[in-house]
Amino acid sequence: MPELPEVETTKNGISPYLEGAIIEKIVVRQPKLRWMVSEELAQITQQKVIALSRRAKYLIIQLETGYMIGHLGMSGSLRVVEKGDLIDKHDHLDIVVNNGKVVRYNDPRRFGAWLWTEKLDEFPLFLKLGPEPLSEEFDSDYLWQKSRKKQTALKTFLMDNAVVVGVGNIYANETLFLCNLHPQKTAGSLTKAQCGQLVEQIKQVLSNAIQQGGTTLKDFLQPDGRPGYFVQELRVYGNKDKPCPTCGTKIESLVIGQRNSFYCPKCQKR
């Protein structure tokens, strides 16, 4: 599943082709995604793109009359193609702009979304989201207060979008390894120092992943077709039975909250 770095990479990749351009039309080939594609999108014509931004794992395209909001789901990706390029099987939506380019949405599993809102601050899916992990608001004091009396597993806690957005499975695993914290440790048992370390490493891991263009495991590609190279930096995620890069102990895995978790039993003692 594309996580925050992959969505940020996608935003950065398509921004030069969209910002300031005029959308001539939006072609919807398959409206049945996770939710039905908003009917307003097919009616957009001759609208200027004001800006692109991101909230959590949502891509936001600001137009003159409102906002297109995209989510890549489990297998979605956006790529920049030329008008007239062949359409692939899972190409479900095109944003056709006046510079000869098409921003094309591909999603084999159709678990993504394309929605519309006129008022971003009233968009229902954004109302209960926590702070952005790379923002100043997300600091050790905030995480310390949020974690008090929480009996949930630490990894589940970090992946809760009401706590902090965008820390998905890949990057939660990597962060906990770098902090020498077991994924099943209860969130409420964190010390103030551990909260500070977690915040620092979350910011560092996500920033590094963005610089590397995200992580390509199966479906994700950057808008220019290149893979995300952070996959080469993964220390524990997906590395069950491989040696820990720190101590050489075999990496183990377990399921927490229906997600695979990877950790070193020696470096990350519970």
UniProtKB/Swiss-Prot annotation:
EC number, as in UniProt: 3.2.2.23, 4.2.99.18
Record's catalysed reaction(s): Hydrolysis of DNA containing ring-opened 7-methylguanine residues, releasing 2,6-diamino-4-hydroxy-5-(N-methyl)formamidopyrimidine; 2'-deoxyribonucleotide-(2'-deoxyribose 5'-phosphate)-2'-deoxyribonucleotide-DNA = a 3'-end 2'-deoxyribonucleotide-(2,3-dehydro-2,3-deoxyribose 5'-phosphate)-DNA + a 5'-end 5'-phospho-2'-deoxyribonucleoside-DNA + H(+)
UniProt: DNA binding residues: 90, 109, 150
Cofactor stoichiometry and binding remark: Binds 1 zinc ion per subunit.
Keyword line: DNA damage, DNA repair, DNA-binding, Glycosidase, Hydrolase, Lyase, Metal-binding, Multifunctional enzyme, Zinc, Zinc-finger
Keyword Cell wall biogenesis/degradation among UniProt keywords: no
Cofactor(s) essential for the protein: Zn(2+)
GO molecular function: 8-oxo-7,8-dihydroguanine DNA N-glycosylase activity; class I DNA-(apurinic or apyrimidinic site) endonuclease activity; damaged DNA binding; zinc ion binding
Family annotation (Pfam families): Fapy_DNA_glyco, H2TH, zf-FPG_IleRS
CDD domains documented for this protein: EcFpg-like_N
Gene Ontology biological-process entries: base-excision repair
Zinc finger (FPG-type): 235-269
InterPro entries in alphabetical order: DNA_glyclase/AP_lyase_DNA-bd (IPR015886), DNA_glyclase_Znf_dom_DNA_BS (IPR015887), Formamido-pyr_DNA_Glyclase (IPR020629), FPG_cat (IPR012319), MutM-like_N-ter (IPR035937), Ribosomal_uS13-like_H2TH (IPR010979), Znf_DNA_glyclase/AP_lyase (IPR000214), Znf_FPG/IleRS (IPR010663)
Domain of life: Bacteria
Positions annotated as active site in the UniProt record: 2-3, 57, 259
Role of this protein: Involved in base excision repair of DNA damaged by oxidation or by mutagenic agents. Acts as a DNA glycosylase that recognizes and removes damaged bases. Has a preference for oxidized purines, such as 7,8-dihydro-8-oxoguanine (8-oxoG). Has AP (apurinic/apyrimidinic) lyase activity and introduces nicks in the DNA strand. Cleaves the DNA backbone by beta-delta elimination to generate a single-strand break at the site of the removed base with both 3'- and 5'-phosphates.
Subunit structure: Monomer.
Family label: Belongs to the FPG family.
Protein name, as recorded: Formamidopyrimidine-DNA glycosylase
Organism whose genome encodes this protein: Pasteurella multocida (strain Pm70)
Gene that this sequence comes from: mutM
